[in-house]
């Protein structure tokens, strides 16, 4: 820990995934790395036995391209896949273009709207492009489950369905709640865990990853493999990652997300805004740092040997460097210091051609303008930001309820939302 005191920007800040010679770790050492950040491994003893064989395992992650953009919360299982790749194992990333026609009901109290094939295809391509910012494409088998799911005939489907009972499916927490509350459950939703389980059979998965809300589906895969005379997969679940507010899970709808396509300065600033108590969790779930170094950081923080601000800067630089490069991470830190320490307006703020035509009452609806300028996700979020004092015009915070303003105030103005977002109106 003395090294970190003397060189806080040493290896904890500059580490980026790189190809290097690695000695083969023992099964126990691999398990320690794999278990870092995991919520559950079911059963852990079976995973250890698989690792002891010394042959590469087939690690499965299935994703439904129901939304195109990925944030750090979505990337948690991708990071774990990358960990497996670095340990020498094989990865199969399944794009659920077949299951996306249903939509995963996990954690929902209503039926998901079904997407068209065109929407799914477009979302899938965007997802894959972002996923390969994390995964090594050369070590990833990319499969689309429409390959096998859409070729199932009625006989195949009936045989598959015969392996599960309605009572078993209703054990799922979300289905159970909807059933007891007399909320509708569409019959096609019952098929989702069966189809996800069948994916594991087709690719012969050794381990399947998923969120904690996916455990039922993962166990269904294990159960189906056993019934078909195969060695069952191990189920590894990962916790939900809290967003920048430190309370709600990371989500665009909560406005607390850090997107993989965010600009480096935005990404850096958002990471710096997370509560200190979430730093180690972000290191384990969202960073590219090796587990032994994260263990050392956790010990240093607990012993009060490391300054939280330096550790958080290391985290922010590590995350930015993982998605861009070290130069971008360094520039993002300098931009952060300029804006936060000197309260300056950045030199390179984007411009936005605003329509300042007044409404009938002679004002401009600022909430919509903020959304149009990508300073807020929606007019509703913009109103909440205004009410919270988070919107400034030419450096002056607007009072609450200032949704409609004089267009003269906005002509050529610099709009600021929070501490990181700026736009020059032209």
Per-range role (PLM):
Residues 41-105, 207-215, 221:
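N-terminal catalytic cores of NTP/NDP-binding nucleotidyl/phosphoryl-transfer enzymes
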Residues 225-426:
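Conserved nucleotide- and phosphate/pyrophosphate-binding catalytic cores
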Residues 103-107, 152-158, 246-250:
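Short acidic, glycine/serine/threonine-rich loops at helix termini
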Residues 38, 114-238:
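Divalent-metal (Mg2+/Mn2+/Ca2+)-assisted nucleotide/phosphate chemistry catalytic cores
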């Amino acid at each position: 820990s003395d090294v970190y005191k003397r060189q806080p920007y040493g290896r904890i800040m500059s580490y980026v995934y790189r190809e290097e010679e690695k000695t083969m770790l023992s099964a126990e050492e691999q398990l320690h790395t794999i278990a870092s950040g995991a919520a559950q491994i079911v059963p852990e003893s079976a995973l250890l036995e698989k690792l002891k064989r010394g042959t590469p395992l087939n690690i499965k992650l299935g994703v439904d391209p129901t939304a195109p953009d990925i944030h750090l919360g979505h990337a948690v299982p991708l990071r774990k896949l990358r960990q497996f790749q670095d340990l020498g194992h094989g990865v199969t990333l399944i794009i659920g273009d077949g299951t996306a026609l249903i939509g995963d009901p996990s954690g929902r109290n209503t039926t998901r709207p079904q997407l068209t094939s065109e929407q799914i295809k477009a979302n899938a391509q965007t997802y894959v492009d972002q996923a390969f910012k994390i995964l090594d494409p050369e070590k990833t088998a990319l499969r689309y489950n429409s390959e096998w799911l859409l070729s199932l005939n009625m006989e195949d489907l009936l045989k598959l369905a015969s392996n599960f009972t309605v009572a078993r499916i209703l054990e799922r927490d979300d289905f159970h709640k909807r059933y007891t509350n007399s909320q509708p459950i569409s019959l096609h939703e019952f098929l989702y865990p069966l189809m996800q389980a069948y994916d594991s059979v087709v690719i012969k998965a050794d381990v399947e990853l998923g969120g904690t809300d996916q455990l039922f589906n993962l166990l269904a895969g294990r159960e189906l493999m056993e019934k078909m005379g195969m060695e069952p997969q191990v189920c590894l679940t990962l916790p939900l990652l809290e967003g920048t507010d430190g309370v709600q899970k990371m989500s665009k709808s909560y406005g607390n997300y850090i997107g993989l396509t965010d600009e480096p300065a935005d990404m850096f600033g958002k990471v710096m805004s997370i509560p200190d108590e979430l730093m180690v969790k972000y290191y384990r779930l969202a960073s590219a740092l090796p587990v032994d170094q994260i263990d050392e950081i956790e010990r240093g923080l607990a012993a009060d040997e490391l300054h939280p601000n330096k550790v958080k800067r290391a985290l922010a630089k590590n995350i930015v460097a993982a998605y861009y490069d070290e130069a971008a991470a360094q520039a993002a830190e300098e931009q952060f210091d300029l804006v936060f320490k000197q309260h300056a307006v950045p030199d390179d703020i984007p411009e936005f051609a605003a329509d300042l035509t007044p409404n009938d009452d002679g004002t401009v609806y600022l909430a919509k303008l903020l959304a149009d300028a990508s300073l807020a996700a929606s007019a509703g979020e913009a109103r909440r930001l205004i009410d919270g004092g988070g919107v400034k015009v030419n450096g002056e915070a607007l009072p609450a309820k200032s949704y409609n303003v004089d267009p003269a105030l906005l002509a050529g103005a610099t709009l600021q939302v929070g501490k990181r977002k700026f736009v020059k109106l032209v």
